[in-house]
Each structure stands twice: as C-alpha cells, then as structure tokens.
C-alpha cells in the first residue's frame, strides 16, 4: 500500500485540546478571581497608604551630583577650606534695573543679604562681591544695570533639602520690595534643577493623558472592538497603578531613591510594556480562538506561547535597566533600581493579573472573541518573499539602516540644560536677565584652588599667585580670571614695579619748587659776592693809598719829633729865664681877678704842656712806624682775598649750573617715570607685578583676602570665566589646559608641589562627559551580556541569540542616527548628553523583545521545516508584534509633549528605534538572516532543513487549514 507524503502546509496546526495543562497557568485560571482581587487590594493599599509617585519623587529626591567626580570633590573641598559649606548646591540672585543701579538698589541688596545670612538653615554662605568696594566691579555689569550674588545652599543639588533651600531663598526675595525699576531673579544651577523637577512633574500628567489617548486610538484601530480595548486598558491601568504604587512605596520608605527622570521614564515604560504584554496575551489568545480552539485551550495556548516571551522580555528590560545601577553618574544610577523594580512589577502583573483577567472575561460570552480573522495572509507573503530572496531583502534592510548609521559621525551633544527647559521657567528667566548684561560664562564660572603647606599672605607668594592667574588667563578661550591680585578680573591698579618707582619720585616732585628756589638763591649769593669783590677791590686801592700816606706821615712825624723836641728845649730855656716872674703869678692870691695876671699865668701853663705833647709825639712815632710796616702787608693780602672771592663766585656759578641741570634732568626723569607708571597702569600690564609688605596691613585689602584666600592663608582660589559657552565641547576641552597651566605656573616656585583643585560648570560637565562614556560602556556591555544570556536561555541557540543582539545593536545605531538627523540637522537642536545612554539601554532591552517573540514563534514552528517555519512565524506573529511595536513606539513618542526637551528627545529616539526595529529589523532583517543561515541559525541545536515526510492530512484537517 502506497502512502502519499507531502511537506507540511504553511498554516499553523492547532494543538490537541486534550493536551496536558501546565501547573502555573492552571492555578492562575483556577484562582483567577482571588488573584484579581488580591491585585486590586494591593494596588489600593499601595496608592492609598503612600503619596503619589510624583509627590514621593519630590519628597525623596536624590542628588544628581556625581559625588565621586573630581570637580565635585574639588568644589566640596574648596567649600570646606574656605569654611563656606559642604554642599554642592549654589544659586545666583540677579538684580536687573532699567537704569544703572544706585543707592536704593544697594540698600535693597544689603537688606536682602542680611535676610539671607539670617537663614542659616537653608543658606550656608554668600559671596558678597557687590557689597565690597574692592570687588564690586567684578559683580556688576559694565553698563551698571545688573549685579549678582552667589548663594551656597544647604543640601546637595537635586535633593529635597536643596530644593527646599531654593524655595526658601525665593520666599526671602519675594517678601522684599525692590526699588522701582529693579527686578530680582533667583537662578543658578540649584534653582534650575529645582525648576526642572517641577516642570517634569507637571509634564507627567500630560504625558500620561497623551499616552492613554494614543493607546486607545491604536487599540481601536487594531482590534476594532471597544470591549477588547477596554479590557486591555484595564490590564494596562492596573499594571501601571501597581507599578506606580510599588515604586512610590519603596521610595517613600527610603528604600530606593527617585529623580524626575526616573519617575517620567518609569510611567511611560510601564504603560508601554504593560500594553505590549496585553497585546501579546490577547493577540495569542485570539489567534488560538481563530484557529478553532475552545476558550480553555486558547487560554493555555496563549500562556504557553507568550509567558516565556513576556518573562524573557520583562527580565531583559528589568536587567538592562538594572545595569544602570553599575554606572557612576547619578543621572543613570538613579534610573536603574526604580525602572528594574517597576518592570518586575509589570511582568508580575502581566503573567498573573493578565491571564487571570483573560480567564475571567473569556467566560462571559464573546468579550475577547476576535472581530475579524488575523491578517496573516499579508505577513505570510512577506515571509514567503523573505524565504525566496533572503539576500536582497537583507541588503535592502541594511541599506535602510545605513540612512541612520551614516548620520552618526556628525553627532554632536550638548551639556547646557537650559536649552532643554522651557524659557518661562523662573531660573531660565534669571539666566536670560543675566545674559542681557553679563556674558554667559559669568554665570557659570570655574573655580580653581591652589592649596599649599604655608601661609601665602606675603609678597613673594603673591608674585606666584599672579603668575598662576596670568598663566590661566593666557589659556585660549579664557576671558576673565578673578584672584586676589585681580579682584575684578583686571590687575590691581598701581601694583607694577614701574609705577612703584614712579611713586618714589613723588616726594622729589613735592620738593622740586623748593629746590629750584634754593638754586635761584645761589645767583643772589653770586651777586652779593660780586658786590663784595667790587668793594674789596676799592678797599684794596684805598688801603694802598693809606699805606703810602702812612709812610709819608711816618717820615714827616720823625722830623716833627725833632722839631718838637727842639721847640721844647727853647721853651725850657725861656721858662728857666722867666721862672721868677712866673712864680709871682702863682703866689698872687688875686691873680684870677687880675686879667693880666691870669693871662700870663695861662701862657706859662701852656708852655708846660709842650713837655706832655713832646712825650706823646715821641710815643706816637713808634706806633706810626709799626703801622707803616703793617699797611703794606695788609695791602698785599687784599688781592688774595679778592681772588678767593672771585673763585667762590665762579664755584657758586658752576654749582648753580650743575644744580639747575640736575633739577631739570630729575624733573625730566620724574616725568618719564610717571609716564611709565601711568602707561603700565593704563595698559593693565602686570608683567612686573609687586605688592609691598605694607599693603597686607591695609583694611580694604584684608577684606579682599577674605574672598580669595582661606582663613589660614594656605589656599588661594581663582574664579575663571570662559569666552563662550562653558558647557560647549570647546569649554569642556579647556579644563585640562587650565589645570596644566596652573601646574606649570608653580614649577620652581615656593608653591611647587601644592595641590590643585578645579571645579565649576565646564569641569563638572567634563567629568560628566568622561563618566557618560564610561557608564555607557559599562551599562551597554553589561546589558548586552545580560540580553545575550536571556536570549540564549530562551532560544537555546548561540547563533540565534547573537543574531538578536547584533540586529538590536544595528537597529540602535540606525535609530539613534535617525534621531540625530531629525533633531540636530532638521530641527536644529543638538541631542542632550543624557539621551544616548538612556536611549541605548532601553532600546537594547525593548528592541530585543520583538526579535525574541519572532524567534520564539519560529522555534515553535521549526518542526515544519526552516522555510515553512519562517512563513508560519511571520504570519502568526506579524500583526501582533507590529501592533505591539507601534503601540510601544508611539507611547514612547508621547514624551514629545513633555516640557523637558531632553525627555522628548529620549522618547522620540526610543520611539524611532522601536519603529525601525518593528518594521525593518523584526519584519525583514532577522528572518532573512535566519533564512540565509538555515540550520546554522539554531546551532548548537540540530534542526532539519525540511520536515519529516508525513501522510496527507485527513479531510477534516484540510478543511481546518483552509479556514486559516
């Protein structure tokens, strides 16, 4: 007897309705109602006993600051050394006036500073530059219409305490009445993060509404049944409520931390995954019902065909997201545990609550009955085309992938969070106000600190400090460096050596007129000397004449002495003869009364005087002779005296000329020195910077020391501003150059070997960039390994698992390239730096789901032969997987309505990746690879290229196939 044999038909064969019932689905079906009630009670308890997820996220918000980053360590250490606080949270308060800020604005500012300093709970310290005349210009705009103060807040950035501190500062500012025409803004990184969280929480409700709208529309389009869509929505809503409640419960009790990114992604991911799993379950149930199985058999077929896929998919997503916990950046680290726990809850609900709802609702009439036959014919044609032309189809799919892959080299990221937040956020408005008067970098400076082992408050170390500031300022792209040697960003006036030298001539300048007057008096002295010379020459002439006269007088007197003696002798003779008569005149008592008597007596008395005169003349003659001897000597001395006075006159004239020349020269030198000092000041040239020791005792300068030097003087800090955006790639690239410049500047100086700390905006984002690369590598590799292991366990094929992972990676590159094309090149918005890591991890996990479902279905149908199995798998899973993929993709794209552009970018990137994975990779690439590899696709399993020959099916079976 000859038995006719043929290959198996391409339609799926319904399983035996009397097959064994596995324990788990049987228990779920048996206790479906208690399971549903248990879930409802659990959901009610979780959502009633603790606040909603958004509220818990605000209460238990964790810091987004990477504590292990060098910049963060530096900022905290700088705060500790300067005794300004130990947090990394800072805010800027900006004052903006319609006119230059005056005394009223200063009074308001002082009042505000006092209120802030009084709030020690929320404010740790202030950098009051505007309140100090020495540093005021550094905190005020060039037009005088704006000023700012930096406030160090309590709590690390992103934490609930930091957000509370931001609100406290806003409250203080709002309670004060600024002067007319002056507006006050609270901005800065801490305020921006707090506003970002509020915007994210506001957006979450809108996202949920849009997401459910998208899901309802998609389900109605796919199933054309309000009841079926309502049942699926019930499953999704219950799964979402369970996930929200569970994560909120854990967060409320401080078991896990939350962030605005975690809550946003968790909600949308839970909705999308719950919808996908509901589609998998109901789709497979309706497929089984369409093949003629009864409700119970269809239930078990559904569970047996999808449970392992849902479990594998959920574990893949949970495991991949949990890999984010291995990262170092809190932005990613805080996503790991909440998303993983949320996905575990979604999977648990999908594998217990979902089948229980299907088991209950399937007993009531035709609630879950398919309204139309599944569209398998079109997908079978796709499968047949793939089996027939696997190579060209694979090439076409790869060509489509190249559209995105070729865009990747032009990928540029952006680290400025402001660009991805609404412009009307208070912090963004504050930044905008500041940028109207300051450069963008002034609000986002870098802070470099050099810490030595000794007190640097001395002239020698200040030379090194200025050298460091100059070296940093010389770095390309640096526009401003504030330090103790340049408090307002410019060198301190009058601190150059040329100016100090010019100042030393100030006293000479003050005595210049006095010295000139003294020099002028020398001419008067010369005139006096000349007068004396003239008198001396006249005196010399007279003295010469006197000498001659004296000599003649001596000669004459010598003769006169002889004559007088001779006269005396003759008178003596006369007296001797007339002595008797003379005696009469003397004894006559009345001689006085007798005129003749008294007259003759007087004559005789006169004759007696001749002796005295002779004696006197004899005594005078030696004197005259001596005078005659001295007068020539005196006359001889006079020319020498005149010559001496003439020499004095000449010397005085020479001295006058010399002094006058010196004074003119010193005046000219003083003018050159002053001009040189003024030139060095005007040019702001500090090549010869020097501060004398007495400056350190100046009270104003000591206030400046408090701003830039630590209390013990062992550390000095520099405030550095970039020329452009510090959060750009160019700004980030300068960080290494700044460190190198500071290190090179202290070589060979007393500060050599000092510790250098650098923090700030660009330094932080450099660490984030480096950490992002590291975290992406760690999370990506760990996620790929985990996905490969799960795929390997599910498919039990090394090649199939490798193909799934490889196609997912290819899909990831293509989809991210498409996102770059749309956002960067079409919309003109660079992708935020968070997008790559978030999208990669989620796409790695979710993208593998649809390939897993296809390969799992292919594994079920492989007994019919590889090519037939591909056709059957494509026909059986095509519509379900496509519907699930589209729902998941558009659900993620609902992030586009978020106020946070970064979440819109993450959502659209994931959505485009899922569309590409669903429509290209799962539909064409993976099955074409399976067709090309043939039996090697299932290695190390042994499969047949063709099925084992079997008898022709019975007429009943043929009719069944015909229905399909």
Swiss-Prot record:
Family affiliation: Belongs to the resistance-nodulation-cell division (RND) (TC 2.A.6) family. MmpL subfamily.
Lineage: Bacteria, Bacillati, Actinomycetota, Actinomycetes, Mycobacteriales
Origin: domain of life: Bacteria
Residue spans crossing the bilayer: 31-51, 203-223, 230-250, 255-275, 302-322, 340-360, 389-409, 773-793, 803-823, 826-846, 880-900, 923-943
UniProt function note: Part of an export system, which is required for biosynthesis and secretion of siderophores.
Membrane topology term: Multi-pass membrane protein
Oligomer status and interactors: Interacts with MmpS5.
Subcellular location(s) per record: Cell inner membrane
A Gene Ontology cellular-component term: plasma membrane
Organism encoding this protein: Mycobacterium tuberculosis (strain CDC 1551 / Oshkosh)
Keyword terms: Cell inner membrane, Cell membrane, Membrane, Transmembrane, Transmembrane helix, Transport
Protein name listed in UniProt: Siderophore exporter MmpL5
Pfam family, any one: MMPL
């Amino acid at each position: 007897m000859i038995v006719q044999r043929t290959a198996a038909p391409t339609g799926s064969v319904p399983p035996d309705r009397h097959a064994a019932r596995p324990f788990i689905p049987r228990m779920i079906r048996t206790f479906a109602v208690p399971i549903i009630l248990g879930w409802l009670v659990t959901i009610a308890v979780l959502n009633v006993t603790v606040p909603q997820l958004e509220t818990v996220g605000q209460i238990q918000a964790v810091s987004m600051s990477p504590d292990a980053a060098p910049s963060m360590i530096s900022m905290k250490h700088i705060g500790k050394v300067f005794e300004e606080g130990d947090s990394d949270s800072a805010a800027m308060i900006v004052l903006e006036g319609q006119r230059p800020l005056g005394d009223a604005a200063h009074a308001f500012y002082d009042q505000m500073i006092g209120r802030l300093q009084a709030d020690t709970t929320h404010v740790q310290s202030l950098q009051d530059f505007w309140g100090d005349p020495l540093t005021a210009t550094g905190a005020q705009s060039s037009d005088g219409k704006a000023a700012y103060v930096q406030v160090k807040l309590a709590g690390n950035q992103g934490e609930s305490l930091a957000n509370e501190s931001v609100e406290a500062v806003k409250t203080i500012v709002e309670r004060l009445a600024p002067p007319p025409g002056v507006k006050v803004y609270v901005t800065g990184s801490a305020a921006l993060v707090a506003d970002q969280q509020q915007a994210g929480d506001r957006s979450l409700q809108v996202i949920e509404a849009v997401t459910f709208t998208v899901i309802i529309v998609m389900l109605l389009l796919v199933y054309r049944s309000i009841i079926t869509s309502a049942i699926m929505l019930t499953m999704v809503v219950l799964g979402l409520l369970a996930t929200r409640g569970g994560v909120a419960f854990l967060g409320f009790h401080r078991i896990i931390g939350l962030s605005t990114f975690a809550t946003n992604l968790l909600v949308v991911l839970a909705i999308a995954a719950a919808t996908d799993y509901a589609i998998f379950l109901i789709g497979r149930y309706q497929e089984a019902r369409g093949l003629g199985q009864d409700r119970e058999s269809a239930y078990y077929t559904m569970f047996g065909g999808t449970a392992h896929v849902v479990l594998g998919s959920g574990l893949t997503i949970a495991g991949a997201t949990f890999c984010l916990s291995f990262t170092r950046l809190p932005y990613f680290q805080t996503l790991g545990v909440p998303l993983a726990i949320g996905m575990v809850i979604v999977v648990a609900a999908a594998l217990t609550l979902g089948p229980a709802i299907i088991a209950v609702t399937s007993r009531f009439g035709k609630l879950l009955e398919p309204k139309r036959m599944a569209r398998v014919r079109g997908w079978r044609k796709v499968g047949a085309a793939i089996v027939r032309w696997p190579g060209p189809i694979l090439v076409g799919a790869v060509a489509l992938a190249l559209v995105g892959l070729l865009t990747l080299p032009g990928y540029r990221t952006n680290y400025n969070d402001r660009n991805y937040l609404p412009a009307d956020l208070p912090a963004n408005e504050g930044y905008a106000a500041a940028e109207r008067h300051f450069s963008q970098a002034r609000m986002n400076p870098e802070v470099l600190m050099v810490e030595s082992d000794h007190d640097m408050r001395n002239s020698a170390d200040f030379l090194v400090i200025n050298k460091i500031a100059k070296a940093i300022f010389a770095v390309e792209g640096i526009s401003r460096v504030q330090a103790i040697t340049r408090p307002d960003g410019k060198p301190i006036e009058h601190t150059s050596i040329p100016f100090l030298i010019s100042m030393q001539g100030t006293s000479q300048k003050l005595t210049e007129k006095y010295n000139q007057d003294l020099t002028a008096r020398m001419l008067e002295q010369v005139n006096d000397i000349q007068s004396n010379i003239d008198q001396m020459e006249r005196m010399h002439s007279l003295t010469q004449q006197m000498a001659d006269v004296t000599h003649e007088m001596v000669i004459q007197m010598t003769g006169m002495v002889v004559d007088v003696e001779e006269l005396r002798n003759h008178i003596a003779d006369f007296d001797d003869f007339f002595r008797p008569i003379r005696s009469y005149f003397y004894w006559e008592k009345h001689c006085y009364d007798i005129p003749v008597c008294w007259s003759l007596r007087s004559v005789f008395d006169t004759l007696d005087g001749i002796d005295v005169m002779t004696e006197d003349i004899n005594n005078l003659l030696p004197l005259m002779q001596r005078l005659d001897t001295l007068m020539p000597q005196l006359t001889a001395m006079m020319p020498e005296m005149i010559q001496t006075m003439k020499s004095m006159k000449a010397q005085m004239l020479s001295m006058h000329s010399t002094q006058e020349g010196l004074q003119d020269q010193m005046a000219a030198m003083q003018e050159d020195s002053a001009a040189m000092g003024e030139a060095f000041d005007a040019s702001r040239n500090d090549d010869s910077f020097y501060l004398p020791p007495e400056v350190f005792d100046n009270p104003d300068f000591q206030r400046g020391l408090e701003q830039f030097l630590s209390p013990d003087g062992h550390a000095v800090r520099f405030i550095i501003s970039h020329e452009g955006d510090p959060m750009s790639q160019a700004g980030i690239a300068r960080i290494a150059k700044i460190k190198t410049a500071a290190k090179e500047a202290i070589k060979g100086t007393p500060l050599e070997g000092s510790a250098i700390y650098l923090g700030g905006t660009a330094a932080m984002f450099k660490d984030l960039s480096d950490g992002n690369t590291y975290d992406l590598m760690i999370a990506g590799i760990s996620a790929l390994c985990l996905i490969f292991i799960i795929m390997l366990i599910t498919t039990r094929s090394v090649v199939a698992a490798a193909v799934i992972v490889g196609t997912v990676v290819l899909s990831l590159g293509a989809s991210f390239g498409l996102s770059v094309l749309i956002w960067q090149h079409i919309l003109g918005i660079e992708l935020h730096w968070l997008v790559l890591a978030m999208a990669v991890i989620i796409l790695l996990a979710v993208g593998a789901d649809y390939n897993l479902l296809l390969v799992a279905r292919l594994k079920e149908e492989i007994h019919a032969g590889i090519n037939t199995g591909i056709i059957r798998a494509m026909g059986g899973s095509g519509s379900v997987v496509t519907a699930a993929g589209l729902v998941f993709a558009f659900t993620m794209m609902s992030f586009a309505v978020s106020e946070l552009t970064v979440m819109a970018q993450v959502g659209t990137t994931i959505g485009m990746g899922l569309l590409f994975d669903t429509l290209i990779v799962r539909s064409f690439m993976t099955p074409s690879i399976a067709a090309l590899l043939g039996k090697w696709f299932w290695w190390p399993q042994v499969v047949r290229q063709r099925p084992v020959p079997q008898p022709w099916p019975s007429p009943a079976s043929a009719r069944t196939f015909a229905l399909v």
